[in-house]
């Protein structure tokens, strides 16, 4: 039985003690000594005495010093001189020998002290080196010690990948200082100098220290020498690596034709292939040929670059595990596996001595017969080669096969994986062995949930959030997941679950969720189940009362991810507010208070535990990297309010590192890569066999258990019911048993289990992954008749769905499908819309829903038009749903108000979709560009209403529209204008199109925008850009609807950076945040969706309003007043009748009434008080001549004849005299000769007539010297008003040849001479009409211009006004800067 090993905290190694030693200065040879002065004096005196004595002797004649006697004084002299000058030749020293010996002894003592210091440093080096690189023969005894597998590939452990090969010499960690005042070679005292030299020689190296090579420096090493020595060293290297490096960090491979030499490596976990499994576990990576090795380990070289030396770098070692390959077969195919640059993360050891491996000197270790290794020397710190000549490197380590096998067998008892299995603990087998037995469920199809939960009602008890999910692998004991916080004795509050495809992750997620549901009633436990992908793991729980929401496919839209996070933040805020209202700090305290209150018969708002399951969260982090920090914050803040995160993914990588710090428990199934396993906190998960549901349960670093998850989605058989005459199989749980097999390096097939339960089948894939039966196409269990066999899990879920309980919904459906208008109105009113129909007392219309994920609701999106927001602006790009928004607004008003209360008049310039509202009783008109008259009449009608209400409100004493509504619909006493309208809405779909088509009309609309709201006339417009609106009216829209904008700069409700997040979907928009959220920008925005303008009974794709028309028509028979239209022909008598009743002031009433205004259906007069002339133009058959005939008919009605032949008029009655130019002779009978002074129809006649007219007008010129009173009374002349009527002026020559040029000077002085000029001209070539002097003069006099049927391509005619196609008799009467459409009264004209 294997024993578990978890890497403990590394022990502190012996510390190398570097020393800084300053060498002692050796002695110098003493210099010659000078003589004392007294000795010199004595010598001189003695020599003098001796000389005197000799002189006296010779002087006396004595022969004492004669002959042989002369020797005595000679010796005396020499002796004295020797005494005086001894040492002058250097033979005498400074000191005596005893003193010199003493100084030598002192120097030697100092060297001994330095030797001890150097030796202490050397001993620390030896202890340190042997700590990290012990002798191979000591490794077997150290197996299982804390020193095992201590190397770390984190870039900080400089011994990772460093392996001992023998013992040798190295320089000490001593810095030598030069002696001070060092004697020269001549001055050096020989004894101390020799001693210092020998000291330096022996202390410059440290002997018998481990010598190492690094796997991270060279891509391979060639071991060259006697085979037995080579194999002995390779065994030592393998044992060193296997002891100090875990199998998760270093893996080893042997390629050899001599398998007997390598049989012992089968025991080492480092030689196991985690991707291939056989009966003995991981398949051994021992191969007989390069071809076999390359075929099995092709993935090892895939995507890897050249070898990169990394030992000098502080970065983490990658890739891991580092791979060591022992090449013990001489095969030329190695050239196809490795090049001179090597392979990243791989180190080869060649044992063949082939030239392919030995050609590079720095990668060669040469043996001799004595076991001495020679190699190129390297710097100990940088591993750089410092010499190109091989030196003595080390005396090789040797390990025999027996020693190596003993070590390997001892190491085989330990595995990193087994550190998580807690082997050796003998737990008593108490209680149930499976989930159903634990809950006392005999029949999953017949569960008494009341009884089941009766014993688990204590939300504060130990069983809270504690549920079984599988069995321990070592003893089959039922394993529990406790999601409570660590301070409550649990494993949570949050956790992760990981496992590659086919590892059983989805099954485990379901099992944990269902087990928790069995342990808690829905009042106490709620789930939010989210899946970034399809949701296969969570969809089966739809409809279960424990489940608040199931959210799937989050990866399809990042906005949904942000929405989900907002919902979680909102739930934290909601729970915090509940706790604050009760005066408590957290959910635990709140539920304690609630339990006490319920015991007293008083209830409080529930605050159940909330488990948020997020499947495939790694995809979330990949798409939205900021989610890591957000979820980490949610986890930290939510724990106090019983919000628990359970996050699952196929893989976990470094980007989730911050989140993992806050995770308690970890359920880790098989990992795809070592990195994923490391990130999940269980490195050996990558080595798990391909068995669904098999994994590790990590509670803490020391408490990690291997388990087998229970499969609740097994077939369900009702107890007591036979199957094909046989009794249904009992649900059992036991442990698999496999017969023992011989353990070798060869692949050993896995035999079939002879005991244990049926395991859900899995299918192996070529890449080593497995697929669960749920993931296999056609994997559902069906009998021969195709009937699906029910599963235990689904049977339990079906029963849970029958429990009547409505959970709190903290996730509302995404804004993908618009709500029907009646459902929206019902939600807004709080009742069915048809009940108390028309009782609304305001003008608030719901048009859609506002998505508030933070508040967990979707309230109606409303438009309030009763106050400052009377006018509504809808902004949006093309295709954003502006027309639909208009339809919805009208339908909403129709469902909340009666046709007497609100009326709508629509101008559809965007599409025909708005015509679908035309049959709603509240809609009086829908006109578009194909009905320009209807458009003009609609605007004119509402403009007339504004003007009429200005007058009538004043007469009735109505101060505001609120008073008007109270009097008309609220029963308040007081007079009300009887205009037949309530609040009226002018709806313009595409303001810009209307403005471009009709300049005159848009000015009238602008008047309504600015003045209408005060009198109950509202304007609702749509536009792509706000800049399309005329500047004077941009501030006139108090209500604003922003859909997806064409330019985010137009956003006013939210900041532009948020407005760009509106999706490209019709009806989607954004409004400002309408609640307080301290951590949010108030202009961050909330997403909106316009409702569908149809009832809920219609299909979801129906946007026509027919259903609303039918529903509203059943409730009311009233109808909005239609727009009044002029008839196609309007007789002059009818105009005169209207004129007789006209009481208006300042419009020329009582004068020539010649047309009806479309604006207010009132007569149009030739108002001579403002202008004395009129021009008429239009295409053929448009009614120009008829216009003249009507005017002449009115002249005859209002004026007395004024021709020269006519009798004098009655006193006080004005008279008229007509001068007629009629080339087509159609007006000759319009007036009699009593009115027509002259007429002409050809050029000569016109010339003559103009001369006479000019003469007559010249006589009316005011003479000089008139008084002011005379000028004002125009008393200087008397006689009839002169009307110059010219039909078809284009038939007369233009320019200087114009026959009318004599009358032209009087046009601008017409008021002084009583002249009125009325001219018609065809429209063709109107742009060149200025060449005619008469028309030019009329333009200068600002004469009104009636443009009848015309070609708009002629461009602007006056100001920004254009002509256009019009029916006969219809025209645009243009003044200086305004225009109004009129219908000319018809008069019969001679043809």
UniProtKB/Swiss-Prot annotation:
GO terms for molecular function: ATP binding; ATP hydrolysis activity; DNA binding. Disruption phenotype: Mutants are defective in the secretion of EsxN, PPE41 and PE_PGRS proteins. InterPro entries: AAA+_ATPase, EccCa-like_Actinobacteria, EccCb-like_Actinobacteria, FtsK/SpoIIIE/SftA, FtsK_dom, P-loop_NTPase. Disulfide bonds: none annotated. The keyword Cytoplasm does not apply. Residues 476-678, 858-1052, 1161-1354 form the FtsK domain. Keywords: ATP-binding, Cell inner membrane, Cell membrane, Membrane, Nucleotide-binding, Repeat, Transmembrane, Transmembrane helix, Transport. ATP binds at residues 499-506, 876-883, 1178-1185. The chain crosses the membrane at residues 38-58, 65-85. The keyword Chaperone does not apply. SMART domains: AAA. One of its GO terms (cellular component) is plasma membrane. It is found in: Cell inner membrane. It is a multi-pass membrane protein. Part of the eccB5-eccC5 operon, which is essential for in vitro growth. Part of the ESX-5 / type VII secretion system (T7SS), which is composed of cytosolic and membrane components. The ESX-5 membrane complex is composed of EccB5, EccC5, EccD5 and EccE5. Part of the ESX-5 specialized secretion system, which is responsible for the secretion of EsxN and a number of PE_PGRS and PPE proteins, including PPE41. This is ESX-5 secretion system protein EccC5.
